[in-house]
Curated annotation (Swiss-Prot):
Primary gene name: SFL1
SUPFAM superfamilies noted in UniProt: Winged helix' DNA-binding domain (SSF46785)
Subcellular localization: Nucleus
Regions of compositional bias (Basic and acidic residues) in chain numbering: 171-181
Protein name per its UniProtKB record: Flocculation suppression protein
Additional detail: Present with 1040 molecules/cell in log phase SD medium.
Low complexity: compositionally biased ranges: 8-19, 134-147, 208-224, 708-719
Biased composition (Polar residues): 236-247, 679-699, 738-750
Organism whose genome encodes this protein: Saccharomyces cerevisiae (strain ATCC 204508 / S288c)
Length: 766
């Protein structure tokens, strides 16, 4: 098949191209026409790609945008649409319909806006001034384009006659309606005509898609804006509605892999921006900055630098002076032992005066530096304001009293101990002469921050007031006022040991016992104000230190000092085991001894009788922890605590009946063999604790006894004599009657029948 057969049939000159004509058909016709003008070499450039014709040199697959742009500029068939400027540093673009069609040869789109966006991404920017198509055609490039066009018209290729006529009609319309021509230039100037090696240095900007879209919107809004007339101008194809409708109706982009349908953005109407008078952008021009500066800017800058150097020298001298003062004082302080006290005090006073003078000098220096800094800022602002007012309004502005007039007040960070008062002075007498430069006028108003009457202001050392709640009473005035309603009345407990009418405590009967209610309010303790938090119940380590503690201002304590603090605590309550009147006077005043419970249940070791009686004393059951069998004088020891508890119970039963046990009872040998334990008699368990209840307990029926073998223990004559001597003293003792049941029972019987009726039992002497 020949190459002529692949080209579509020619259309009549009067009829436009059909709507179904693809993108490649127009390009193929132009390519064939150019090929005929060059001598018939267009057959090499025409290639068949499926059902579509692609004309022109095909760029490589891996070519990037910048190489494609250079190839488009070198393509002579597109010189009437895009071409180099005479300088070779920029290029011109005619944004018409034919240029959008030509983009399909190198790119996969026909959108001029996308092409401009890619130019912005690679560093190209649009030159501000626009060119018209008539001015552009007057140059050498226009002549070249005209010659090529006439040569194309005179070519003998008949296959492209229809497309040429169509292209000629479009060109005639473009000439009748001249459009603006855009000029683009690379920001770094690397993109030049003939410099192919410099293309590899042009890189894509690492900018986001949002920035590129914003730039494209700015370019699209500025492309049709006429700065001179202030009106928005449209290209010929957009200004004529009929032309635009026909042109877009005939043009349908054909992209490989895309549907043959008109995109939606071609159907939408173009939304124009409102007219706006844009102010000229301020460029970073050094010449303009030099013009905005005051004429004496360099002289003022040099003066400021000199003053800063003087300040540094002053700081160094001040540090040296301070170090010398400390060194001299330390050297003199070692001689205080060899010098009299008065002379040493004079040395300390001289050192303090020198420190005060040094501190005042440093404060003056600081004030001078701060005022000069404010004066410098204000002077520059005043000069700039005057220059701006002179350039805008030629009328003379009202002159101020001084160009260096500072602000009325300045914010300064002042230590909490030093209280400065701003004072205005019309002269600079407080500033040393070395700091009075010629640039400072004598009428300058400095904001002087001077201390009050005291020159040497020291921070008040307030000791942290942490009251000692253990050794020192808390005064009334020390309590904060927010607790006044809490303790409006004194809540101190009665002191049961305090004597009445300043009399010493004696053995007289009194009503204030230790068993009284400790929460009873005191009648009068001499408190003048409200008590706001408890006494002697505050732990300093747990106290909330975030609350401010007032100072100790009250001389009077909250309770009398002569009373010991330990008596404020309530005495422990004792359980009333019996009548307190039954105790003797010497035992009544002595505190009772409390013993803890025994962990061992003593009654579980021996069987109890069925008819066990409960003691009527204080409503408690009789549970002895120290049990002796009548026939066995050896004691059976369970625990010392249980023994003491039983004895304490027995001590409260009857008056004058408590006799201390012998120490040998507590250390008696325990039984080695549990099988040799004696029998526990029911009469022994049911025996009364004192003599008063013996009549009520004598009617109890005895329980059957448990017979156990009884060990024989030797007895001595000393034990018998001791028992006979103490027998008369222990007749009324409840413990004695408990341990020696037979003796107490036979005391009321006939003494003649004692040896016959009573069995041989051993007695345990206390």
């Amino acid at each position: 098949m020949s190459e002529e057969e692949t080209v579509s049939a020619p259309a009549p000159a009067s009829t436009p191209a059909p709507a179904g004509t693809d993108v490649g058909s127009g390009g193929a016709a132009a390519g064939i026409a150019n090929a005929g003008a060059e001598g018939g070499d267009g057959a090499e450039d025409v290639k068949k790609h499926g059902s579509k014709m692609l004309v022109g040199p095909r760029p490589p697959q891996n070519a990037i945008f910048i190489h494609k742009l250079y190839q488009i500029l070198e393509d002579e068939s597109l010189h009437d649409l895009i071409w180099w400027t005479p300088s070779g540093l920029s290029f011109m673009i005619k944004p018409v319909e034919r240029f959008s069609k030509a983009l399909a040869t190198y790119f996969k789109h026909t959108n001029i806006t996308s092409f401009v966006r890619q130019l912005n991404i690679y560093g190209f920017h649009k030159v501000s001034h626009d060119h018209s198509s008539n001015d552009a055609n007057s140059g050498d490039d226009a002549n070249t384009n005209d010659d090529s066009n006439t040569h194309d018209d005179n070519s003998g290729n008949k296959n492209s006659s229809g497309d040429e006529n169509t292209g000629g009609g479009v060109q005639e319309k473009e000439k009748s309606n001249p459009t603006k021509i855009w000029e683009f230039k690379h920001s770094s100037g690397i993109f030049k005509k003939g410099d192919i090696e410099g293309l590899k240095h042009i890189k894509r900007r690492a900018s986001s898609r949002n920035n590129s879209s914003i730039n494209s919107r700015k370019n699209s809004s500025n492309q049709n804006y006429d700065i001179d007339s202030g009106a928005r101008v449209r290209p010929s194809s957009i200004q004529d509605p009929s032309t635009s409708s026909n042109s877009f109706g005939n043009f349908v982009p054909q992209i490989p892999g895309a549907n043959n349908s008109i995109p939606e953005y071609f159907n939408n109407s173009h939304v124009t921006y409102e007219n706006a008078n844009h102010a000229p952008l301020e460029s970073n021009n050094p010449e303009m900055q030099e013009q905005n500066r005051p004429p004496n800017f360099q002289d003022e800058t040099l003066k400021h630098l000199k003053e800063i150097n003087f300040d540094m020298v002053k700081i160094i001298e001040s540090m040296q002076h301070f170090i010398s003062l400390q060194h001299s004082f330390c050297s003199q302080s070692f001689t205080f032992k060899n010098v009299s006290k008065k002379k040493s005090e004079n040395i300390v006073k001289d050192h303090q005066k020198q420190l005060q003078a040094f501190e005042s000098d440093m404060l003056t220096f600081k004030q001078h530096v701060m005022s000069r800094a404010h004066r410098t800022i204000d002077s520059l602002c005043a000069v700039n304001a005057a220059a701006t007012a002179a350039s805008v309004a030629p009328a003379p502005a009202p002159t101020s009293t001084s160009a260096y007039a500072p602000k009325s007040q300045y914010e300064m960070m002042v230590p909490p101990g030093n209280q400065y008062v701003p004072q205005k002075s019309s002269s600079t007498t407080n500033i040393p002469s070395r700091f009075n430069t010629a640039s400072v006028p004598p009428s300058q108003l400095f904001v002087q921050y001077q201390p009050q009457s005291q020159q040497h202001v020291t921070y008040a050392k307030q000791p942290a007031h942490v009251p000692n709640f253990i050794n020192q009473p808390i005064p009334i005035q020390q309590l904060p006022p927010q607790y006044a309603d809490t303790f409006s009345t004194p809540q101190m407990m009665h002191n049961p040991f305090a004597s009445k009418n300043n009399n010493k405590p004696g053995n007289t009967k009194r009503t204030n016992s230790v068993l009284m209610d400790p929460l009873t309010p005191a009648a009068s303790v001499g408190v003048q104000g409200p008590l706001n938090y408890p006494i002697m119940n505050i732990n300093p380590s747990v106290r909330d230190y975030n609350k401010p503690v007032p100072q100790n201002m009250a001389p009077s304590p909250i309770y009398p000092i002569n009373e010991p603090t330990t008596r404020l605590y309530s005495q422990p309550k004792m359980r009333s085991l019996g009548s307190t009147s039954s105790l003797p006077n010497d035992r009544r005043n002595s505190p009772l001894k409390l013993t803890p419970r025994s962990s061992l249940n003593e009654d579980s070791l021996y069987p109890k009788p069925r008819n066990s009686l409960k003691s009527s004393i204080s409503g408690t059951s009789l549970s002895s922890s120290f049990t002796l069998v009548a026939n066995n004088p050896a004691p059976i020891r369970y625990s010392q605590q249980g023994l003491l508890r039983s004895l304490n119970k027995a001590a409260n039963c009857a008056p004058d009946s408590v006799t201390p046990l012998d120490s040998s009872v507590l250390t008696g040998p325990p039984p080695k063999n549990m099988d040799n334990l004696p029998a526990v008699s029911s009469n022994l368990i049911n025996s009364p604790m004192n003599v008063e209840h013996s009549s009520s307990l004598s009617q109890a029926e005895p329980a059957p006894q448990i017979e156990l073998p009884q060990p024989s223990l030797p007895t001595t004559s000393t034990t018998k004599n001791t028992g006979e001597a103490d027998n008369s003293k222990r007749k009324g003792s409840g413990v004695y009657s408990l341990l020696n049941q037979e003796d107490s029972s036979t005391s009321s019987a006939d003494p003649k029948t004692e040896d016959k009726a009573a069995p041989a039992l051993k007695k345990v002497k206390m």
